[in-house]
């Protein structure tokens, strides 16, 4: 052959580990066989993607022609450069190559590419492929009859030779073996490297935990969260909370109301919350009343001390609880005073806005009464020129018209 082909290895764009042997036209991605099965078996839409082999010369484009003389698969441009440049290479036996879609099995791919995985004859694989693959071997081996007649005359021997995969046949054989082992060991799942995040970068594989250990850990956690759980191994009894008594007790002590099995009602919790809320409200009311009385008494004491010039230090000996209630009530009183002031300011603003709106409406009505509807001429020069221009049927006559 006149030109020398450069054999370059292209890594798979999905896993980044194995050599890419297929080119997906829809995704414009180069994939190895396991990743191709993994990607295009995701849904029905991805199964429609047409894939074909990668050119042996440029390793960038999908193949369109197979050269039997040089045992190469070439894209359209490389085929034109190789076989269209000289007359000697134009006589090489070539055939068109078509892509495939779907998710063919390992045996079907091996039969298409002429690779013997199970030791069977290629004719048996060819018959199996014709029945199951969804497209005949003629589209793979010889391509379209019209294209084949335009290239070179072909015979039966050309069909038998059309199974050659090119220079990457050994790589395809290894990936088919890997794919076959993945189907057998994984029960139909494709063996794809773990940690792939889509961009070709591989992350560290996360440690896996067996399903049995997860069940055991869940059962242990469930036993540890039971209400009557007792640690017999250490000899220490755990305290449990009794919602009926409102306090904690030992698991061995009998409860007034025994719970039956796993049926557990939260009525006691609701009652407990309601009782707590009622107690808090009562305590708040009492503290508010006490503070009100203290405030009135302190006010009177201050007035008396002012009149008698005696410092008002009457209630300085109050307990800490009373002082806490006093601070709480003062905070509430201050908040209520601020809210009252805010409401008063808002009402004043609304009244001012209403008054301003009434004044504006009155001014508008006064202007409307004195409004004059006289016909005024805004552009006097245009008016004068329009009166002197010639009209025909009410329309102006252009200066260029005769």
UniProtKB/Swiss-Prot annotation:
User: Where in the cell is the protein located?
Assistant: Nucleus
Region Disordered: list its residue ranges: 287-322
Where is Zn(2+) 1 bound in this sequence?
12, 15, 35, 40
GO CC terms of this entry: nucleus
Q: Where is the CCT domain?
A: 357-399
Mention any Pfam family matching this sequence.
Answer: CCT
**UniProt-annotated binding residues for Zn(2+) 2:** 55, 58, 78, 83
Please give the coiled-coil regions recorded for this protein: 345-372
Cite a single GO MF annotation.
zinc ion binding
Q: From which domain of life does this come? A: Eukaryota
**Gene Ontology BP term (one):** regulation of DNA-templated transcription
Q: Where are the zinc fingers (B box-type)?
A: 12-54, 55-97
Stretches of Polar residues bias are at 295-310
- Alphabetical keyword list: Coiled coil, Metal-binding, Nucleus, Repeat, Zinc, Zinc-finger
Family stated for the protein in its record: Belongs to the CONSTANS family.
This chain belongs to the protein called: Zinc finger protein CONSTANS-LIKE 14
What is this protein's gene name? Answer: COL14
């Amino acid at each position: 052959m006149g030109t020398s082909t450069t054999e370059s290895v292209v890594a798979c764009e999905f896993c980044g580990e194995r050599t890419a042997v297929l080119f997906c036209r829809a995704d414009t991605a180069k994939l190895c066989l396991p990743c191709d099965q993994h990607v295009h078996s995701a849904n029905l839409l991805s199964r429609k993607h047409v894939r074909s082999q990668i050119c042996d010369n440029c390793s960038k484009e999908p193949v369109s022609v197979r050269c039997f003389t040089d045992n190469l698969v070439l894209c359209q441009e490389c085929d034109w450069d190789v076989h269209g440049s000289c007359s000697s290479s134009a006589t090489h036996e070539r055939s068109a190559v078509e892509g495939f879609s779907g998710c063919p099995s390992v045996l079907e791919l091996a039969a298409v590419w002429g690779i013997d995985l199970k030791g069977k004859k290629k004719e048996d694989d060819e018959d199996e492929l014709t029945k199951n693959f969804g497209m005949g071997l003629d589209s793979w081996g010889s391509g379209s009859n019209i294209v084949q007649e335009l290239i070179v005359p072909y015979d039966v021997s050309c069909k038998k030779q059309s199974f050659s995969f090119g220079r990457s046949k050994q790589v395809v054989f290894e990936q088919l073996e890997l794919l076959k082992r993945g189907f057998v060991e994984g029960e139909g799942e494709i063996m794809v490297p773990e940690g792939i995040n889509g961009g070709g970068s591989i992350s560290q594989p996360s440690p896996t935990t067996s399903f049995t250990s997860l069940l055991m850990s869940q059962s242990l956690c469930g036993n540890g969260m039971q209400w009557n759980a007792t640690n017999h191994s250490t000899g220490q009894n755990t305290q449990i909370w009794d919602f009926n008594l409102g306090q904690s007790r030992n698991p061995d002590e009998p409860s007034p109301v025994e719970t039956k099995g796993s049926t557990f009602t939260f009525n006691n919790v609701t009652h407990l919350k309601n009782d707590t809320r009622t107690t808090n409200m009562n305590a708040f009311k009492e503290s508010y009343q006490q503070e009100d009385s203290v405030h009135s008494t302190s006010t009177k004491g201050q007035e008396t001390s002012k009149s008698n010039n005696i410092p008002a230090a009457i209630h300085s000996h109050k307990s800490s609880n009373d002082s806490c209630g006093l601070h709480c009530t003062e905070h509430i009183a201050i908040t209520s005073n601020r809210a009252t002031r805010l409401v008063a300011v808002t009402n004043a603003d609304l009244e001012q806005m209403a008054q301003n709106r009434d004044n504006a409406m009155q001014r508008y009505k006064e202007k409307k009464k004195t409004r004059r509807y006289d016909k005024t001429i805004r552009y006097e020069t245009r008016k004068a020129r329009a009166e002197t221009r010639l009209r025909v049927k009410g329309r102006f006559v252009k200066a260029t018209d005769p």
